[in-house]
Amino acid sequence: MEGLKVDKWGYEVKTNSDSCISSINSYYHQVLSYGRERSVILEAPKQDPNCVLANILAAHYLSSADSSRAMPLLEAAKSYLEQASLYEKVVFDAINCLISPNRDDDVAVELHFKLLKDFPRDLVSLKRAQVLCFYMGCPDLSLKLVEQVLSVNKQESYIYGMLAFSLLELGRYTDAEEAANKGFEIDSEDAWTHHALCHVYQYKCRFKEAVQFMEKCSRTWSSLSSFMYTHNWWHVALCYLEGHSPMEKVRDVYDQNIWKELERSDASPAEVYLNAVGLLLRVYVRGGINVFGDRLKILADCLTNKAFWHLEWHLDVLVVWALSCTGEVSKAEELLEGLKSRISNVTKKKQQHMQRAMLLAEALFEYGKGENERALEFLDETFDAINYKIIGASDEQLDVFNEVWITMLLNSGQATKAIQAIEKLLKKREGTPFLWRLLEKSYSMSRKQEAIDAGKKAQALEAAYFN
């Protein structure tokens, strides 16, 4: 075929432009490294307006934030599809399905499986498929995808971070640590591998080790996207918080490494707000929000801006809480109504999945207002946040909703139920001081002698990590 070049993976692309291929390859690197210059893909269609791969990748990049600009690129890709290489046609099919209105997630995943079967070195398509699986709450599919291409990518560092995260989400922490360490050996600057290892250390209550590791790695994070930069620091702050470091230390990380990101001219505010509000909810549940002064109110004022609504469910659920908690009740109600409308506009199959997310948002709205008993009415009797992956959140991000659930039970005088929920969590992570404090409170409310031992355990753990 005339005018063929090959991309980073060695796959054929119909173009005569070296600069177009260079922009595509730069985009690949930015995606896999969580760089902040993913917009480089917009250069590729300028360098060759007839290149299908350039147009469809640029359309995908713009699809979530600026769909009106994405449409002409999608149409350009369609119009030149007949002349494209087989690789480009398969990528086009997968992305076209992914960005279509009311897409069928299952079909989109299947198309990516097909793509990766024929073109297994395409790690950006693997990443794209894994992100889709994450928002579907299907880590099992994510693992199958990466395992399908692992054998031909064993020398690629990025593959191991992607493998590790899938394993983490399936609770296979030992396997995840092994995979992440392999990736770290190949490339010690891969931020997604840092992230995976921090997940492992955090889950295993190795809080000090996690903080030391991440702070050492942080010198390589300046070029990360707003999300990845602040998310890695969110993990650091969370380790300080869970390890019972002084609340002022958590506040310092919030100020210097999360909120400060907004000062950068190329920051993506919504990505920062997700990590900021997620951390402040954790602090709030622990009764430490006073140490943060007016930071929650400042954040909530930013979140009244509807430009940050309906970007993703996880953020919306947290925003509902932040608004209701700071007195912006009418705004929170407006966001809730928008979520209900959003659900009504998707396929019946997706409506069933997202109903659970809607109930969680309703519960967080009531919790923010201090209506604990009302909030509990929206959640199952045997609530477990692990069953809410559909909002697009990791196990660590979901954990806070278990803490909220237990807190609401205690605030409603339901100590026996709280004890059952806490004991279930302690079987997984018995080194968490806050859970022992909650257990102590639950036992005290039930007038049980076990409160003394729970308090001693909490005190010992509070002194174990950072004191």
Where are these regions (language model features)?
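Inter-helical turn/loop elements of alpha-helical hairpins
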Residues: 18-21, 26-42, 46-50, 55-106, ...
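Residue-level recognition of tetratricopeptide repeat
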Residues: 19, 48-54, 86, 119-125, ...
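Structural register within alpha-helical repeat arrays
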Residues: 19, 26, 58, 93-98, ...
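Structural motif corresponding to the intra-repeat A-B loop/turn of tetratricopeptide repeats
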Residues: 31-34, 65, 100-102, 119, ...
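Internal alpha-solenoid helical repeat scaffolds
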Residues: 75-193, 200
